Amino acid sequence: MRPALVATLAGGILLAACAEAGPAPQTAPGGKATLLPEDRLALPEFDLATYESLIVELRGTPVVVNVWGSWCPPCTVEAPDLATVSREFEGRVQFLGVDILDARAPARDFILRYDWQYPSVFDPTGAIRDGLGYVGQPITLLYDREGKLVFEWNGVITADLLRKEIRKVL
């Protein structure tokens, strides 16, 4: 991911998280920080135009976009696989989550529960999904280095299928 874009996404997430900062996180067994609800990640709100601009800006890097919701049972099924595959391709493929039709607190909890290390944006009305012409969720989209959509999957995606499709664009 381009350094400026990483800084923008990370800065937006961290700035919002720090704006509400309270006491320092408690360390849980295993060395992971347990954040109090008021200290958890804030998801930047996106719309279709911002999403499309982001895909253009990321040209040169393959991008996996996953449209999800914390309330979506199939999304919970695929969440661990997304975390695993995103780590396997870290530095070579940019992952981006798009949380739709959700409330911020459950969305933050979902991200923390599945230990996603990639950015996720907040689309409370589902405008991005609807604007792209999809129905239902989860949806996984893969864009090649030129920013062209080369693979789409509506429903639960497996780690094996996602790996196979990513390898085609590397």
Model segments located where?
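Structural microenvironment flanking redox-active thiols in thiol-disulfide oxidoreductases
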Residues: T76-Y114, P124-G131
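N-terminal targeting signals for export/organelle localization
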Residues: M1-L48, R163
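A short beta-strand-turn-helix
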Residues: A42-V63
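Thiol/disulfide oxidoreductase modules built on the thioredoxin-like
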Residues: D109-Q117, P124-L170
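C-type cytochrome heme c attachment motif
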Residues: S70-V77, I139
